[in-house]
């Protein structure tokens, strides 16, 4: 641990697990390099500060005692995700400004603000008004950002909005993507999606730099493309989660680990579809039967509420789990880093969220790719066609026989070298964090960049 530099970094994550987790990992990286860190977080989805004792947490809220939260959990439970992002940006804009002003005027030198890219130009306005430099964190990959940045072109060329008749056509401007791989999602307000994406891209262009949770050897061409488009300093210092000096924390419930310990090496399919994705009951049942019929041991994470219309496992046929016995295990949550690192894991059936993609790459685990929305589609295409460490299982083909076929193919490999390529990619990920690796060098540049910012004080 380096000595405190007497300088503070303010961080503003988007309040979703897939965005908060990499931001808190980045906070740990800065803390290890001697910076103090303050996390400004919305009262919506506010985390448990006791889990992160090295950082100062501030709740962003303009509530007076007894007033309703500006964005209640009940209000957002059934809300269109794009509409939710818009509400977050609208309702927390002024509380955010007041919070940053209070922090900058608090005495300790504030080096910069690090904000999630999706907050967009909202944070730029505040940073300029208060007089603090702003650096953007892109929690997703560079490849998907290139696709987002191309939205105006894609609309001009007629790729967007997506037409069902063109799903399998190649997007010649963004190889190897097909039309169905473009990072869109179902929304009642498609124009709002375009506005959110444009605001994210323009906010990155006007920043003092972009931090990427990726590594150069994985996305070199995409990073070069992004650098050319954005024309700001860029720092691909990932994978963030590999910087931690502490071993992966063990779960309080040892049942998962004990079960994995009893399985043969590389024999288990681990299935988990992220913190936001929801599936229909029919899909859930096809997954269940596909896993069972594959005759491979499986560990399946099913979040409560992730199957529409049910609380958890009520849809399973009577006696299903008893019939599986010790060959399969369904849980509400699993320590994913711990699971992927276990020698029993032979494949990861994933929604292809960026954090999950990186975690699987870092453990050399081949992937079965079932993307759900936005950047997950791009990630899946790169996993399958560029890095060649996975197989595609599209949601439109979620039928038990197809599931069984793909699971067997990945686990048996059929000579296609999935596992060998996965292990080679793992080696490249390991090297990037070594002393001479690209991520380590970019981290040194990032620290120097942040320290080069002039000292700013809040002028009232």
Curated annotation (Swiss-Prot):
List UniProt keywords, sorted A-Z: Glycosyltransferase, Transferase
Query: Is this entry keyworded Transferase?
Result: yes
UniProt-listed InterPro entries: UDP_glucos_trans
Q: Which family does it belong to?
A: Belongs to the UDP-glycosyltransferase family.
* Protein name (Swiss-Prot/TrEMBL): UDP-glycosyltransferase 76F1
Record-annotated residues binding UDP-alpha-D-glucose?
275, 334-336, 351-359, 373-376
One family name in Pfam for this protein: UDPGT
Q: SUPFAM superfamilies this protein is in?
A: UDP-Glycosyltransferase/glycogen phosphorylase
- Top EC class of this enzyme: transferase
> Which species is this record about?
Arabidopsis thaliana
- Gene3D superfamilies in the record, alphabetically? Glycogen Phosphorylase B
The catalytic activity of this protein is classed by the Enzyme Commission as 2.4.1.-
Top-level taxonomic group: Eukaryota
Q: Name one GO molecular function term.
A: UDP-glycosyltransferase activity
PANTHER family assigned to the protein according to its UniProt record, in alphabetical order:
GLUCOSYL/GLUCURONOSYL TRANSFERASES, UDP-GLYCOSYLTRANSFERASE 76F1-RELATED
